Each structure stands twice: as structure tokens, then as C-alpha cells.
Amino acid sequence: MTLADLVPGDTAKLEKIDTHDPGVIKLMILGMVEDITVSMENIAIGGDPLEVGFFGSSVSLRKEQARHFKVSRI
């Protein structure tokens, strides 16, 4: 399951990150690293972008980027 598969209200643990996308590296610099808990806050009309919360903050990312984050639902 990937971050892109979550729906608003879901909470998950980041298990593995595919770092082949430069945009994913930027998100990791912001704190989206393995073993943290994230929550799907909102999905825009049309399904893109996604708003993801972690460490008391939220970031928006494209669904294509979210597919690089493997998660397990909590």
C-alpha cells in the first residue's frame, strides 16, 4: 500500500521510501522519513494534490510522488 492509497482520516506508518524522484528527496528534507506516523488530511477535488500531516505540520504533494512512499495503515 502507498501513501496515495490512503483516504482522509487514515493514519499510517511510513515503511519504505523510493528515492528515485527528486521531489521525494525534498519531502524527506522536510521530515517525511521512514518510521514516522503520517495522516491523510485532505484530497483535492479531482484527486490531486494530497494534503498529508506529520509532526504537527501539513504538506501537499502530488499523487505521483505519494506512490513512492510505502505505508502500513494504523
What would you call each of these model-derived segments?
Residues 22-26:
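Short alpha-helix capping/helix-loop boundary micro-motifs
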Residues 15, 31, 51-54:
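Short, acidic/hydrophobic/Gly-rich beta-strand patch recurrent on exposed beta strands
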Residues 1-2:
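Absolute protein N-terminus
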Residues 45-74:
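C-terminal structural segments of small proteins and small subunits
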